[in-house]
Amino acid sequence: TERKALEERLEHRAFHDYLTDLPNRQLFVDRLRKALDRTRRKKGRKVAVLFTDLDEFKIINDSLGHEAGDVLLKLVAQRLRRCLRPEDSLARFGGDEFVVLIEDIEGPEVAVRVAERFSEELKRPFLLEGRELFAPSSIGIGLGDARTKTPEALLMDADTAMYRAKEVGGTLRVFDPDMYK
């Protein structure tokens, strides 16, 4: 019915980014919480969160305008999606922040490979209105397992690692507890 379709559209909008149609923060945190619960049932398995920030997005937005920035964000989302396995979850947290959940891994290697693919994809130029634009990124990786207290704690670890990557110039970093010192 029409009412049911409207309810479904409203629910979709509540949990997805309006621009990229990716899951939003609320849906991502829910998926991360469930993934962490699954690590408690699978001994030795981990989840990874990749926190990706576009290093020069503000410059693009300021010089070419918000419409061009929005188009670039859609293109970035498409490229990042192609780097993932079907079971991985990509979300946009707003602005130029993209976050990925990778489940059922043993260690950081798979997450590092995905982050390297992201980095390579974002180094390739984007063609926008006849211009070549670049969207270099900084990526932080946080690993969670049965001992991880909350999804928010794991997101904070990945975010901290991303800022460390940004400090050294557009690279990727795996979270280390020493980063909080």
Where are these regions (language model features)?
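Conserved catalytic/ATP-binding subdomain
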Residues: 26, 109, 133, 149-152
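HATPase_c (GHKL) ATP-binding subdomain of two-component histidine kinases
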Residues: 100, 135-137
